Amino acid sequence: MAKLSTEELLDAFKELTLLELSEFVKQFEETFGVTAAAPVAVAAAPAAGGAGGEAPAAEEQDEFDVILESVGDKKIQVIKEVRALTSLGLKEAKDLVDGAPKPVLEKVAKEAADKAKAALEGAGATVTVK
């Protein structure tokens, strides 16, 4: 049998119906002794067990929330930083700052979360990254 390229395999899969693809997956799992659901279960386990094992969850976490805990005495600077970090208007940014503790950014990369934390703390706010 000639070796098929990835593109040729994808083209062949595109021509199959969902029922045929489902049967293929079952046969593939039986032939190679693997399960298509295993990677999903492994990826979901750290998220579900995050409360129990804090250290392992922190190592594997790739999305972070930046939470404004308190404003401090430089409220205007904090509002300016919130507007710079988000696409919020003046009123929305002021409402967010007034309602602290509130999330400023959600599900961002570690680098973005650290930059946001540094910027907000530089403006006088107290911030946590979760």
From Swiss-Prot:
Keywords: Ribonucleoprotein, Ribosomal protein. GO terms for biological process: translation. The keyword Secreted does not apply. One of its GO terms (cellular component) is cytosolic large ribosomal subunit. InterPro entries: Ribosomal_bL12, Ribosomal_bL12_C, Ribosomal_bL12_C/ClpS-like, Ribosomal_bL12_oligo, Ribosomal_bL12_oligo_N_sf. Signal peptide: none annotated. NCBIfam families: L12. HAMAP family: Ribosomal_bL12. Homodimer. Part of the ribosomal stalk of the 50S ribosomal subunit. Forms a multimeric L10(L12)X complex, where L10 forms an elongated spine to which 2 to 4 L12 dimers bind in a sequential fashion. Binds GTP-bound translation factors. Forms part of the ribosomal stalk which helps the ribosome interact with GTP-bound translation factors. Is thus essential for accurate translation. This is Large ribosomal subunit protein bL12. The gene is rplL.
